[in-house]
Amino acid sequence: MLAAVLTAPPEPFVPPEIVGQKVVGVLGCWCGGLDQGAAALEPLRSLKPLVDVFSPMPYPALQQMLDGSAPPGLRNYFRGGYAAGLSNDLIDAVLDHGARMPSPMSAIHLHQMGGAVGRAGPDGTAFSGRAAAYTYNLISTWTDPAEDGQHIAANRDLAARLAPLAQDGSYVNFLTDTAGDSNARVRAAYGDALYVRLARLKREFDPGNLFRANHNIRPAR
């Protein structure tokens, strides 16, 4: 389950009167019986959402639902983190910033964790934050290079506000900040124990660091 603060897009399923307004959207996936899925959705549907496009669909269709919102050529800046819960301070920060996002293409995502994600051990895979209840992704997207500073600054402001509320680590896919020591940020994203293990594997399988065009883990010395 994912909740997002975003600008209502000009899509056929969106009522014209809310297009361009800041809204909260909920995305989810139920992999099981249709009757059980409908029952799981009932608490959300009882809130009478302005738009409801939940329906049975093939898995590839689910994967393609948001493709149209990310065409080639956009400018992007991402940050993220993990949270133990949805505190009032976290919700207030997200809603306050969400109402002032300078681009209609930007969004703030709150992903529910737990379940299968949390059943793996903390050092069993190359993924940190398995004990977190939520992960948040701050997604800034725009088109004009002249506006880079404005959108990056807005994203960093929210990241700084959320930092005291966050747990250790972050989701590496949303680690696009290039300020400061990038290796230190990558290490912080994975956590010390996991980073050390990955650095040793890097030394074994890629000692020359050929595969480095990424959030790089340097081979252990």
Model regions: which residues?
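Soluble FAD-dependent oxygen oxidases
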Residues: 1-221
